[in-house]
Amino acid sequence: MQQRGGKESSMREFLITTDNTADLPYSYYKENHIEYMYLTYTMDGVTYGKENELPPKEFYARMRGGSMPTTSQVNAETAKEVWRPYLEQGMEVLHLAFSSGLSGSYNSTRLAAEELKEEHPEYKIKVVDSLCASLGEGMFVCKAVELRKAGKTMEETAAWLEEHKLNFCHVFTVDDLHHLHRGGRVSKMTAVLGTMINIKPLLHVDDEGHLIPLDKVRGRKKSLASLVDMMDARLGSYRGKKDAVFISHGDCESDAQYVADLVRERYGIENILINTIGATIGTHAGPGTVALFFMGDKR
């Protein structure tokens, strides 16, 4: 980090923070000096967080066995604890929050930033509502890191992200409708009948950051292939740019690899990141979820 004072102060590297809902490999956070806040979850009477989280395979195995976890949002005090040591050193902080359409974490962190700036007007904190989830939020974070490495200031980085956030596209499918029913996304009748006749829903995250069912198809392979068709309909001016594509999954890596292969075959894109969906989003989407994230003209 450059020294404070004069022109150098405005160009010093800033801290990027986010939520564990970005579903990036933890090694990425460490390598790129990113702090993340953990949305805790409770399963079988035990609350899990950053220090004691379950391995993904165990988490999903318990869900398949009937365990029904619940999640909580980041609170303002947690955000302050993460930011304060850096702010006291004179660093600027850019927080990229989990979609406000899916969690109250954005409002909690926005409140925390306002309270800290009231106490210390010299603190520079910017909170951006990503309107993204899972590796869509992860892609949002990666873009911020890319801009920071290119020498952009915190303000410039935040402005770019605000302008382009709706170009971060999310499409996905689930294998078990009952988890969507639990979250209020589909009716009980739809879940029961859909399961009986092997119906798989296709969903996306809309311009308000909400999770919205779009269509349904019969059969798992068709639902996975439909994700790439949905991508094709959204690429627009991004077609041919071969931007990175991210894929997250609820403990079904072979299905994620199948989607990755379809993307490679159709677009020649080789820069594809695959990672497991963390417990916070996995609680609501369930095992067997596959999500595809990419840059496009519209969500």
Residue ranges and their predicted role:
Residues M1-S10:
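Short, Lys/Arg-enriched N-terminal segments with co-localized hydrophobic residues
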Residues R12-L15, T21-E35, T40, S105, ...:
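Mixed-charge interfacial surface used for oligomerization/domain docking
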Residues L15, K80, R84, P121-K124, ...:
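Generic alpha-helical hydrophobic packing signal
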Residues L15-T78:
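N-terminal glycine-rich anion-binding loop in soluble enzyme alpha/beta folds
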Residues R62, G90-H95, E118-V128, I274:
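Glycine/charged-rich beta-loop-alpha catalytic/anionic-binding loops adjacent to active sites
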Residues G65-L102, N107-L111, A158:
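Glycine-rich phosphate- or other oxyanion-binding loops that anchor nucleotides, phosphorylated ligands
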